[in-house]
Amino acid sequence: MRDDQIFNLIEKEKLREKEHIKLIASENFTSLEIRQAVGSILTNKYAEGYPLNRYYGGCSFVDEIESLAILRAKELFGAKYANVQPHSGSQANMAAIMALINPGDRILGMQLSHGGHLTHGSRVNFSGIFFNTYFYGVSRDSELIDYDEVLKIARDCRPNLIIAGASSYSREIDFKKFREIADDVSAYLLCDIAHIAGLIVAGFHNSSIDVAHLTTSTTHKTLRGPRGGIILSGKDFDKLVTFNGKEKALFNAVNSTVFPGTQGGPLVHVIAGKAIAFREALQESFREYIANVIKNTKVMAEYFKSEGFRIVSGGTDNHLFLVDLSNLDLTGADAEKLLEGVNITLNKNAIPFDKKSPSLASGIRIGGAAITSRGLNENDSLNVAKFIVRALKTRSDIELKQIKKEVVRFIRDFDMP
């Protein structure tokens, strides 16, 4: 690389990743094959449209690449329809929402502070700007989704669309109950499985594909693919919907809202990376990987509990959990900064019914997907939790410096994919 400034910064980032314990639940490591595809000459090709129906010439090979990605996605998820063009999970959600409802219609989504996502109706996001939004959350006592309460809220606000899914909810979501609620109020159901897609395809979480009208996901996080999005559908893929005043099959409506509705040319180099990720996730080794992610995450959560920390909802069924720091003289923002200082990266996170602002937060979110990709086992994950607890409980700069040395020495033994 001739650009020394960029090259040096990339090398610094590589060293940072090598010497830090990555616990951000939305991050992971891709394989070398995926990185090679994303960095390939495919980035040169413009390919507006869909396979065999492009607005540019010279697309025969990229048609094959996108068709292969679609075929593999359908096989992996057990779907009848897949659109692999969305540049991100947020853009996948935008396109899916626009295919199902119209501006001004009502959306019922999970409260952001209870574990939802910006695109599920937040007032600062397109979903809350162009649509009327209502929210459900978790029970104050159990910190679990109360489906009876969701039904009550749905009957009160009569949404046109219900969104199920979360970015910081550590328990299994019952998608069938959400579909029952949606059917009760004649609403569409959109399931956002961005965080749990890997668990679903590996068989460790119930699937939304034949339950929801549409399912969206990112292709990174627990899928270990490149940064990107995907839209899927099962038995409802050809259901007739009213789109721009006309009846249209759902999959055709989605194709229209992705291109030309919300995007121009697809990122063919990223689609190639997605295709590789789908193939990798179809292997038995991927199921073993997800099983280990769940084991490692549970081990860490249980250690925090044994050390007197409160875990939101009492535990975890997936790849993440939230630690409530309210009993410490420490905000989530403080903890994030402190742990960054000892080479452990995670993020501050609001907890349900949080009294602190989102910029401070009362909790931290911990994910086990990335460390498992580096080969950490349950005992290693226990050691990671011990590092964190030591750092959070000490107020000694000398001790923090010692912890940092131990963290670097520990994590260097694990290769990055």
Swiss-Prot record:
It catalyses: (6R)-5,10-methylene-5,6,7,8-tetrahydrofolate + glycine + H2O = (6S)-5,6,7,8-tetrahydrofolate + L-serine. SUPFAM superfamilies: PLP-dependent transferases (SSF53383). It is an enzyme of class 2 (transferase). Disulfide bonds: none annotated. It is found in: Cytoplasm. Pathway: One-carbon metabolism; tetrahydrofolate interconversion; Amino-acid biosynthesis; glycine biosynthesis; glycine from L-serine: step 1/1. The record marks H220 as: Plays an important role in substrate specificity. Its cofactor is pyridoxal 5'-phosphate. Its EC number is 2.1.2.1. InterPro entries: PyrdxlP-dep_Trfase, PyrdxlP-dep_Trfase_major, PyrdxlP-dep_Trfase_small, Ser_HO-MeTrfase, Ser_HO-MeTrfase-like, Ser_HO-MeTrfase_PLP_BS, SHMT-like_dom. One of its GO terms (molecular function) is pyridoxal phosphate binding. GO terms for cellular component: cytosol. This is Serine hydroxymethyltransferase.
